[in-house]
């Protein structure tokens, strides 16, 4: 029989991060709508793709929970949907906090409490969250430098209408 997480700090951390990932998913879905309305189809698609990834992160966390009521105290971004540029900055900041502070700490706690699989999950998701931050910051740079729709030289891009993996120049 596996060790129970009931009553541990790891259980609270799982619920905290599950709530955070779930809320990030919804924020990114809202942000995708703003980006689309502002004419940033690619950024909208990236927000949607990342929202789907956050859903999967939340699902992995939820599967470790064992049921019942768990009381947590946590803070989350509340109710602000800005421009695409503002949303990208906010999303990057949230991703940064997850991969650089929260999840490494949660992994260490899980390890100390005897939950190596949960620790590994947090470390693996941290890698994805760092990639999310980097991608969002690249789009911030593109908007600030007005290179979203204009690049120097030839650019290879993936067509979103063609079969998967089809690239165009």
Model segments located where?
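Non-heme di-metal
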Residues: 1-168
